[in-house]
Amino acid sequence: MRHHHTLTPQSPGTTDGSARRLDSHLTGPQTDTSTRFHIYFDNKGSLTTSPFAQLDVDDVTSFGPEITTINRFTPGIYRYSVHHYNGTSTIIASPARVELTLNGVTRIFTPPATSTTLGIESVWVVLELTVDSAGGITVTPVNTYTTALTDAVARVVKGSGKPPLMGGNW
């Protein structure tokens, strides 16, 4: 399963700088503990050891793509988000899109056109993958925004790596 996060300009040759840096974030269950992993630019993961997921491509100089691959699933909930780390506009106005390729089928997600009041530090919570004990995978679009990438947004309890105990739509 390859989980692709692809960023492309609105039209070829157009790069207005509105979304200079969009970073992908994947969280999910660890295979060997009750904690959760968090893959992003500073913690790229591994395909050969737990969490069996990795940020393969992290484009820091242009408009993507960023590619995250999950090599082996552990039962639980995986969450994929895009953080608008740097730029002069909002993630909604950016040319961002997420491509999820699962079992040979590609689904494309684009930022929902809602409030444009979120600033540079806004986060697009794109989707969740729920993996059952038999290996079945359910894709659930989340398509919400928040103003910061907090532990609750990443589905972990601060400092513990564990899912939140209560609250929100977690």
Predicted regions and their residues:
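Intrinsic-disorder/low-complexity signal
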Residues: M1-W170
